[in-house]
Amino acid sequence: MHTMKKWLKISIEANPLMVEVVSDYLVGIHGAGVDLAADKDENPAGQIVAFIEQAELSTADAEKCATQISVFLAEMAAVFNVASPSLVWEFLEEEDWSKNWKEHFVPFTIVPGLIIAPTWENYEAQGDELVIEMDPGMAFGTGHHATTSLSLSYLQDVVTQRGAKTVLDVGCGTGILVMGAVLFGAERGLGIDNCPDAVAAASNNVVHNHLAEKIDIGITPLSELREEYDLVVANIIHDVLASMVLELYSRVKKEGHLILSGLLADQQVDSIIEIFAREGFVLLEKGIEGEWGAVLLQKR
């Protein structure tokens, strides 16, 4: 007898500025499939719907999960200085629902030459295409992940055109950036995150994509690392990046590169450029996509 899948459906209404960071959190930490009720241009409320598979339909477990998410939402609302989002949850138990849901998520190009494909798709690369297989979320959930695509675009440039061989991904989440760097040609990568669940998710993704020989994932704090890297990337948020300026400076080789993303355009982008310039970084490029920005810096 085939057992029906059990799901916890969580519906969130958030400020549009929070949609991307909340989507990434739900995927990276809770293994959720994330869908948006509408395109952000038509959906100013920023509605996010997440589906989390459950072993059992336990009200206590659901409330614990919802509370954990609510705490994160309140923290992020404070960071973005917006109203705290609302959250409601319900159980779903449907045999065919996940199959229908998977139809939303198809392989797509996140930057030229790099395809993100869901793990169930068995996507075959065409020509010189590079492929990262991941379940929905980091790239699938919103379809808008500007911070990810901006970071990958700069990674592609620094690895393929500027010769970076070693890469550090700070706050690696699902590991998409460090995996992209190695696929572009970097010889070795390290991804670190202070969340054990994110480290577990990234580690699984690295193994699934057969990159474990070149990529290490760990929970070691940035302050405890001693190696210098050709390229460091940090896709986090402005205030955290600003607080890490000295530690990030110490991890970049002289003449090496630093990619910072997760910044709101334009004020936060200009602010972070100024903060890092004071410590000896020179701006090479600034990218804006919608409400988000990223910068490519070089250590002099």
Curated annotation (Swiss-Prot):
Keywords for the protein's UniProt record, in alphabetical order: Cytoplasm, Methyltransferase, S-adenosyl-L-methionine, Transferase
Catalytic reaction list: L-lysyl-[protein] + 3 S-adenosyl-L-methionine = N(6),N(6),N(6)-trimethyl-L-lysyl-[protein] + 3 S-adenosyl-L-homocysteine + 3 H(+)
Recorded GO MF terms: protein-lysine N-methyltransferase activity
EC number annotated for this UniProt entry: 2.1.1.-
Residues reported to bind S-adenosyl-L-methionine: T148, G171, D193, N235
GO biological processes: methylation
Top-level taxon of the source organism: Bacteria
Gene Ontology CC: cytoplasm
PANTHER family the UniProt entry points to: ELECTRON TRANSFER FLAVOPROTEIN BETA SUBUNIT LYSINE METHYLTRANSFERASE
Function in brief: Methylates ribosomal protein L11.
Name by which UniProt lists this protein: Ribosomal protein L11 methyltransferase
